[in-house]
Design a protein with these regions (language model features):
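Sec-dependent N-terminal signal peptides
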Residues: 4-14
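Low-complexity, acidic/polar, glycine-enriched regions of mature
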Residues: 17-191
Length: 191
C-alpha cells in the first residue's frame, strides 16, 4: 500500500518533468525587419516591446503552447517622422491594432535547422508564416547570483508580404517594398 502511495505522489513529477516552461527575456531579444526603400537601399527597423512564452518538451525536443505578442507602437527605425508614419493607418495602424501575434502550429527541431510553421496576425489578418532558424544553446546562464536560471537562445529568419495583411501603402509603385525580411534573436528563461 505504501509503495502505491509513493508512486501516486511521484506520478505528477514524472509526468511533468520533461516539459519546461520558458518566458522570453525582455532584456535579451530583438525582432528586426528590413524593407526596401524606393529600390535604393533597405531600411532597418525593430520592435522594442514583446511578450511571449512557450513550453519545451525536453524528452521529444519539441516546442508547444507558444504565444508571441509584439506591441506595434514599439516600432523603431531611428527616424521619428518615419516611425510616426509607420504607426499610422498607412502601415501598422497602432490605434486600431496595438498588437500583432505569432503562434506556431508546427515546429521541427533538429541539430542543423529549426523550422517554425505558424500564423502571424497583423492588422487583424492571419496568414501563415514560416521561420527558419536554430536553437543556439540551452544551458545555465553564466551570470547572476546564486540561482542561475536555464536559458534557451533562438535565432530565426523569415519573410512576409505586407500586402497579404492589407498593408498596401506605396506597394503599387514599389516605393516601399512589399516583402519584409524578419530577423529574430532572443533568449528565454526557464521557469
Amino acid at each position: 500500500m505504501l509503495k502505491k502511495f509513493i508512486i501516486l505522489l511521484l506520478l505528477p513529477v514524472i509526468t511533468f518533468a520533461s516539459t519546461d516552461k520558458y518566458i522570453i527575456d525582455k532584456s535579451h531579444f530583438a525582432i528586426g525587419f528590413l524593407v526596401e526603400h524606393v529600390g535604393y537601399a533597405k531600411t532597418l527597423g525593430m520592435f522594442r516591446e514583446i511578450d511571449g512564452n512557450y513550453s519545451h518538451d525536453t524528452e521529444n525536443n519539441t516546442i508547444n503552447d507558444n504565444n508571441i505578442i509584439i506591441k506595434t507602437d514599439s516600432v523603431f527605425t531611428n527616424h521619428d517622422k518615419r516611425d510616426e508614419h509607420l504607426m499610422s493607418p498607412d502601415f501598422l495602424n497602432v490605434s486600431k491594432y496595438p498588437e500583432m501575434t505569432f503562434r506556431a502550429n508546427n515546429i521541427k527541431i533538429d541539430n542543423e535547422e529549426t523550422i517554425i510553421d505558424g500564423q502571424l496576425t497583423l492588422l487583424g489578418i492571419t496568414k501563415p508564416l514560416t521561420l527558419y532558424g536554430k536553437i543556439n544553446k540551452i544551458a545555465k546562464y553564466p551570470f547572476g547570483g546564486i540561482i542561475k536560471p536555464y536559458v534557451m537562445g533562438i535565432s530565426a529568419k523569415g519573410v512576409i508580404k505586407r500586402s497579404d495583411h492589407g498593408m498596401m501603402y506605396a506597394v503599387k509603385d514599389n516605393l516601399v517594398g512589399d516583402e519584409i525580411e524578419l530577423i529574430i534573436e532572443f533568449e528565454a528563461i526557464r521557469q
